[in-house]
Every structure is written in structure tokens, then in C-alpha cells.
Amino acid sequence: MALFQAMSMVAQLGYYEKVAGVLGFLSIALLFWKLNHKPFYPALPLAGEPPQRRWFSLSNRLRYYNDCAALFDEAYHTAYAKKGKAVLVPSMGVHTAMIMPESAMNWAMSQPDDSLSIKKAFSELNQTKYSLGHGRYWEDPWQLDLVKAHLSSILQNLIPQLNEELAAAFSKHLGTDAENWKEIELEVIMRRIIAQATSRFIVGLPLCRDDGYLDLSYKVILGMVTTIWATLPFPDLIRAITGPIASWQTRRNIARIQEYLEPLYQERISILESRDGPESDPEPQDLFMMMLRFAQKKRPDEYANLGIMTRRVCAANFVAMHQSTVSVTNLILNIIGSDAEFNTTATLRDEITQVMRGTDAKSWTKDTFTRMRKCDSVAREAMRLNFPLGTRGSMRAVLKDGLESPEGIKLQKGTTISWLASCAQVDADRFDNPQKFDPFRFSRASKDDDDDGKSTSSHAKDAFVTTSPQYLPFGHGKHACPGRFMVDLMFKILLAQLLTHYDLGWPEDYQGKQPPSVWQGELSEPPPGARILVKRRKV
């Protein structure tokens, strides 16, 4: 009750009173933290600071928010990360991040999970103990581990489902008018299309086409992002205050999602508990059914708790929907933006037509999409330039004291290490004209090797799903994201549906120019409100 009274009082304050209150609160919090905090790895250099400096200046702290790309580029190129040395960089709020050199990547990927943990790192990053009420959804993310365990069967079942769902979503949201151009706000529409397509895999029909459920699902995702921004900048003492406040509406929306899931939950429980046939008896093939089947045997306490199962669905939605929406938005903008120079749209259509000729979705396999090398190249190039996780990649949390890096740094328990992934992906020593979107950069490389008889190995090396220390959108090593194979399928089916059935262009006021991405701290995001024109093709 006291919390609601406090929130009501805050709501009655004027704008400037609120700003003054927030600044005063943060000033006290930062002063308290400064007086009680020891330097973070005092022997390591600080990016952008003179030697022997042990604290980041206020100006460098502010650079994290208004010039982060340049600051991190300095840390990568000047003397540290690219040259085999760890370096410290400013992070959100009062925090400092440790950047490891690329030379330490293989060492880190070989460490056991009880020494370096990707799960703990993402639990800290996503702050789900506030937004979802517990850290278990990332520290024990079995809802995601199931995808890796059943990947082959999932992919083959997913192909016709994704094709059907994307076709329905495009018709609904882009329309079927073949005479007139329609202007859309791209990210808003892609959010709805991706939510529908991924929900076909996560909860199946008919819920994946329920607008109320899909809108709530994305509200929860945006609420989770809000909670991250409201907690990560602060020390734990302050997070305990800001976290519950920031996630209050998210918890209400999760309760409403639970109402949508309850009939489905009861139906699936009935199937599982009444069946007496072999494991191969037909069942729904969506992720929710897989989750219930697993929980029945391995997590009976969660199996019996719809609230926990609902939150695991929300965690799966966060992974599947949010990053895919951002990446697809960037992909489409890059295709339109490069069309005048590279004839991108027509080239992709030709490849799609050649690969799909004489087939239908029921006969498509993973190999069908492997042959789409130009589509693959476009997707990889878009991901290279628009790193979906910010600037840093392959985060690992240190779980025990005494672990020593190849450089001789004794890592402390609780430290999170990472790599400057986006800097490595635009390194001029590796790429010609690295800041330019070159849609067929990777398909040209594999074609050159085709002529030398190296086609299979070359294409695999440069494929969208192939990870390396220089390409980290999906991480690297044994914990590389297994969902990347599903993303690969979805992107290619999406391109096939979109480019086969629609013409694309810029609104007249864009004067043929692609709007630039924007930076928020270390996140590069699609231009807010970016619009495109679409028109159904007469095919």
C-alpha cells in the first residue's frame, strides 16, 4: 500500500520536480557508491584515460552515452583488445566492463561452466529476477536448452509452419493491393509479423494469430527492456528499489498472458496425463508442448505451476521476438538502401526463384535454404554491420576466484568479461570498406572459392550461422546460440515471401536515401519511425 501511495504522490509532481528528484536521488546513490567502492582491477588500463588513472572521468562516463562507438573503437584499435591486452571501458551508470582481447577467446570458450558461465552473465544482463520475478529463467534456461536438444526435428517441422504463418502475416499487415503503394512504419509492422511467426513455433495455432496475446507478449518484452535500463546502471542497493517499480506493469501483463495460456495449458496437461501410447503418438509440435513434456519428467514442481511455465514462455518470447525484430528491420532497410548500387532485390528474387522452382513448402528441407547463398550473404552482412546485442559479445560471468587469464589477470568472482564484437566485425584489416553494406560480400567470397574447388568449406566458413571470434552475433563455442539455425530459416523464408510477393521502396521525402541507425549507449538500433513503401506484386 505504501508503494502505491508513493507512486501516486510522484505522479502528482510536475516535470521539473520529477527530474530534480531523480537527479537528487541518483547523486546520493552515486556518492554512496563512490565512497564505498574500490577500484575495479586497478592494474588494468582504462580506455580513453591517461596511464595510471584509476577512475573514469565524468566526461568519459558521458561518452558511453553520447559517443560510445568511438570510445569502444579506441579501446579495440589503439593499444588494447586487438593487440592482446585486456582493457576496462565505461558501462551503464556506475559500472565498468572488462574487455578481453581476441587472443583470449579460445581459452575462455574452453573453460568449464562452473568457472565461466554464459547463463549467469545473461541473468545479470537481463535482470529477470525483477521483470520475471526470479533468476531461474536464465540461470536454468531449460526452455531454450530444449531447442538445442531437438534441433533437427524442430527445423524440419518448422519449415512449412513458418512459410504458412509468414504468408498469412504479410497478407494481413502489408495487404494485397497490387495497384497502390502503402506506407508502413517498418519496425512496428515487423514486430507484429515476427511475433506471429515465432509464436507459431512457441505456442502454435490458434494462439499465434490472437492479436491480444501477441500485443501482450510484446508489451512484456518491452517491459523487460525497461527493467534492464532501470536497474543495470545502479549498484544492487539501488536496483532493489528501481527494479520492482520498473517491472510493476510487466508483472500485470504477465498475469494477463497467463490467462491466455491457461486453456492451452489445461488442454496439453490433459493430453500428457491421459496418453497411454508410445512416445511417437501424434502430439502438438510447438515449444510449449515440448516444455510441458520435459517439465513433467524433469521439473515436476514447475510443471504443476502455470505461473512459472508462463514466465518461461515469456523468456522464450524475449529471445525469439525482440532481437529478430531488430535484425529483420535492419535487414530490410539494408536491402532497399543497397538496391540502386547492387540491384539487390532483383538478384535475391532470381536466386529465390531458381531454388524454389518446381517445389512447395512440404518438400523444402534445410538443404533447400543452404542453396540460397546470396540470401545468406545479405543476412550475414546485415548482422555484421548491425550487431544485435550492442557492442560487446560472448559475455561470461566469473563464478570462482583465482581463475587466471592467458594474460595473467587473476579474475575475481562476480566479474563479467566480454569482447568488442562489433569492432571486430568492422575491422579494416579483415574487410574492404568495412562500414559499407555490401550485400554479396560473402557470396562473392564463396563463389571465388567455388572456382578453386573449395565451395563447401568456403561457404560453411562464411555462412550466416557460422560463428568465429570475428563474428559473434550468436556467440561462439559450445554455447553458441542454437536458435541461430531457426533464425536462418525464418530470415530466408521471410525474404522469399516478402521479395516474391511485394515491391519495396522509400517514401518520397527520403529522397532515395536510407535513414541512419541511432546509438543508445552501446546499442545500435534501427532509425526510430523508419518508413518504407510496399505494394503487392502481380505474380
From Swiss-Prot:
The chain crosses the membrane at residues 13-33. It holds the Pfam family p450. Its EC number is 1.-.-.-. It is an enzyme of class 1 (oxidoreductase). GO terms for molecular function: heme binding; iron ion binding; monooxygenase activity; oxidoreductase activity, acting on paired donors, with incorporation or reduction of molecular oxygen. It is a single-pass membrane protein. One of its GO terms (cellular component) is membrane. Keywords: Heme, Iron, Membrane, Metal-binding, Monooxygenase, Oxidoreductase, Transmembrane, Transmembrane helix. The keyword Heme applies. Residues 439-460 are annotated as: Disordered. Disruption phenotype: Fails to produce tenellin, and accumulates pretenellin B. Also leads to the accumulation of pyridovericin. Induction: Expression is positively regulated by the cluster-specific transcription factor tenR and is induced during cocultures with the natural competitor fungus Metarhizium robertsii. Its cofactor is heme. It is found in: Membrane. GO terms for biological process: secondary metabolic process. Belongs to the cytochrome P450 family. This is Cytochrome P450 monooxygenase tenB. It comes from Beauveria bassiana. The lineage of its organism: Eukaryota, Fungi, Dikarya, Ascomycota, Pezizomycotina.
